[in-house]
Amino acid sequence: MKKIDGGVTAPQGYLAAGVKAGIKASGNHDVAVIYSTVPAACGAVFTQNKMCAAPVLVSREVNKQPYAQAILVNSGCANACTGAQGIEDAKKMQDHGAELLGIEPEQAFICSTGVIGHFLPMDKLLTGIADAIDAMDETEGESCAMAIQTTDTFIKKAAYETEIDGKLVKIAGIAKGAGMIHPNMATMLTFITTDCAIAPDVLKRAVKAAADKSFNMVVVDGDTSTNDSMIVLANGLAENEIILSEEHPDYPAFFEMLVACATDLAKLIAHDGEGATKFLEVNVVGAASWQDAKTAAMAIAKSPLVKTAFFGEDPNWGRIVCAAGYSGAEMIAEKVNLEIGGVRLVENGMNCNVPAERLAPIMAEHDISMTIDLAAGEEKATVWTCDFSYEYVKINGEYHT
């Protein structure tokens, strides 16, 4: 497997574009389209927030189909908490794009992101969809990635290629997300394309499994959004022997590539946490179960006290072991060990009395890894997060305006 440059148009048979439709007050790109030139197996996972937005309800119906061909996206307005009109507007968005693309509406996923509680500006949106479809080609992946952003500070993309059944198979993805990140899948927008030939039912299961290993292991602020989604299209144009089950000899290679792409995007989202100055990797080892390991890691990663300590470059390890302790994960307290940046701070549940000056260079780094051993078993899990800064409060205090 090899990492390559490129966005969602890197695999064969995909066109994309992003345009400025005037939905965002900033005037930035705000409408995007991703299109497969042939029907593609599809798989998706969506937010578990019970106040899910209208486009999520519509796209869940699309995901019941084996194949799809398009993803239509707007940013700047979430179309959430908009009642019956929101559903009607979402379907108009879907119908309009499908008609222009010459496909059935149920072959078009739709996604929206932005401020909750406002109706979509339909005239601008429908014009934007038409403009994006007119502009789409194999070189416009960058503008497409720009158009799905809200408070993001940089484009998030990843791509890989590998040989499957003697054929060169590519996978590529883009993502949006900086705040409201505590996926259960999902709390972000993620779109992945591949030219691998894989059966729709196998792809749907693979997408859920990949989300659990990547996006569901990221937390920025502990909030779960109303909108966001992970959607994968696989159009088969690589012409490998179709992967019909998880037992197929080529399935592991495909799944490894899918997880790698998703994990890269997930880490980029943690790097771009609103106002973030640190990227934090939380490793839990020695857990009684994988779920316990994830539970403890999430508790540490979500803790405002932990996140603010890292912003202040304060090696307050007590906050880390405290969060693990209240997480509910099984542990043997008198055997717990903790390291930050490879330096042992806690051994057998007690302070190692490491001098502050030894830790200062580690705490000043942008990327910091910590590992806590619960001494309760052999399982492990890793969660990615970021710190909480003054800027995070400022961004979210001013977001609506």
Description of each model-found segment:
Residues 1-74, 78-89, 98-401:
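A structural signal for small-residue-enriched, beta-sheet-centric alpha/beta enzyme cores
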Residues 94:
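Generic structural marker for isolated residues within well-ordered, non-membrane alpha-helices
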